[in-house]
Amino acid sequence: MNLAFICKRLILFVSIFFLSVVNIYAIQDRKIEEGKAAAMANTSVTLIDIWSIYHNQAGLGYLEHISFGAFHQSGFIKEQNLQGISFALPTKTGTIGASYSYYGFSQYNEMQAGLAFGRSFTKYFSVGLQLNYLYTHIAGNYGTAQSVDFEIGILSHPINNLMIGAHVYNPSRSKMGGEEIPTIFNLGISYLFSEKVLLGIGTEKDLNRDAIFKAGIDYELIDYVSLQAGISTNPSKYSFGIGFHYLKINAHVGFLNHQTLGFTPSFTLSYDL
């Protein structure tokens, strides 16, 4: 057994250990926080855009245009980078969506492919559902694991300017290679105080972890520029970001601050036909 082989094994072990301990962005932990969501501390269960496919598929039911999106989240190390693409197609019966996300590097990675459907029954209520295929690969003799799970969400618009959203990821308690995939509940409300100011608050509960409380704000600075900020608990984090909107193009940059690990940036770009 030569020194090069030992070094490669050591690097692989350290990388996998680090990813498992500081796995904040793992797909299967549902920490997909694209630019705007990251900037608002992930108070995203009531937001309506192409990114509803990751946060609450009920939001897809209100989309009026074909949309494409791509995002990239930079991890604390490059092996923790997460990226993905999404697509939404409104039809007469509802909106069909598809998404793909990839996390990790050649020695350890996770993939998720999702197919979603969202429908608004009235302007006051919508429902969304998504089926996911999950895949995890660990190099060497560790092998791979695969699974299927689903998620469901609802949105209510009871009065002008007020939105209430609820979402459950993996209510079936599916497992991956004998390990439980997290089951996560999200509940949130948002209120549009004016054409320029949106305030959202929410709570997130993983069945195996303490509840998270979060709040975020979106402020339209000028016609083409918006600012976002947010805070959340367990652990304490704060976030901020900026959005650019021109014609049918939307771009966001969000920064999420972890009290121990520092800032992580997220970038998104979407286009509406």
Regions found by a protein language model. Name each.
Residues I27-L273:
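Subset of outer-membrane beta-barrel
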Residues M1-G35, D272:
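Cleavable N-terminal export/targeting peptides
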